[in-house]
Amino acid sequence: MRNTLIHLALLAGAFVPAAVAQTSKSQAPKYPPIEEYLMPQPAEIALAKSGGPANISDRATIKVLTTSGFTVVHQGDNGFVCMVMRGFSAPTYTPAQFRDLVYDSSVRAPICFDPKAAKEVMPYYELRTKLAMERKSPDEITEGVQAAYARGELPKRDGVSFAYMWSADQNLGSGIGHWHPHVMVFAPYYDNSMVGGNTFGAPLPQLSDDAGTPFAVVVIPVDHNLFVKAEAK
């Protein structure tokens, strides 16, 4: 079943470039200067730590974005990794309308990966970031991710893992903005029917990204009292 789904995803991706070729380059979105995606390091560290509860983030490894990609600025001891994702971490396949978030330099999405997700999922987001920083289009990013996964250059996802996204200072981009504090569940091959078929954007568990693929993400909103405010030290 998994091999079939991967094959279907690869076939779907194969048709994307043809559609893009019909759109003139003048109409295609453009990347802002990379400097617009960057932050002062103290502010980024504080924002990254706001991704999860203090008992997690205070002992987590912290990564920040540089012109060379994400780099470790603090080594933790609990296996969690916190960082601030940018629009580069947009869905690879669906919802299609959010794939262009790669061009939105305002996105700031603090996240704290659990130890399993730090090993299996974070490299996927770091690859997406690398490709976007090379000015690849969403379709070229999809092709790069597919190829890397097929070659075994990205970890295979053999089970569910999760991440906290509890920051009160999150900006998830145009059309979403500031959403509920939530838990990201990385659930390979899930679709929305498997979590109740809830409406996208509702304050209920839902499949948010890349349904039916190895990169599927379920989001589970939590109480607003759990929001964590970024505090620079």
What feature does the model see in each segment?
Residues T23-K233:
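Primary mode marks residue(s) on the alpha4-beta5-alpha5 output face of response regulator receiver
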Residues H7-V16:
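Bacterial N-terminal signal peptides
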Residues P17-A21:
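Sec/Tat signal peptide C-region and signal peptidase I cleavage site
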Residues M1-T4:
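Positively charged n-region of N-terminal signal peptides that target proteins for export
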